[in-house]
Amino acid sequence: MPALPLIVFDVNETLLDLETMEPTFQRIFGDTSAMRLWFANLIMYSAALTVAGCYVPFTEIGAAVKKMLADTRGIKIDDRDKKELTEKFSTMPPHPEVPGALRKLRGAGFRLFTLTDNLLDVQTR
């Protein structure tokens, strides 16, 4: 019997709408582009640590990159803002077309898998 075709998706930004975080970054950093810079650095540091064989939870890397970005801009992120950013990242909605597209792919016989650096408790929200 031939194997069923499969598709593997990245979760953050591919399936989930990262842009929902822009208003929070705008409020804290005064610049929506800070969100893209933060996420690019988050991915870069996560990959570098993985290649180096060092496990650091994605949320910890994200927090460190937020602090680094804030420090370079002379911005103090208070506890309320830290909590809001963590909550926004942990509860990003899917892009509008994702649920229907996944249903169509599954209905067409594809096996669907995801890869993510997120902690298990974040993955199940």
Locations of regions flagged by a protein language model:
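Active-site neighborhood of HAD-like aspartate-dependent phosphohydrolases
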Residues: 1-43
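An amphipathic alpha-helix signature
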Residues: 22, 35, 39, 59-67, ...
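Short helix-capping segments at alpha-helix termini
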Residues: 30-34, 72-77, 107
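A broad detector of the eukaryotic-type serine/threonine protein kinase catalytic domain
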Residues: 43-47, 90
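A metal-dependent, Asp-based hydrolase signature
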Residues: 46-83
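Substrate-recognition element of Asp-dependent hydrolases with the DxDx(T/V) motif
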Residues: 80-93, 98-125
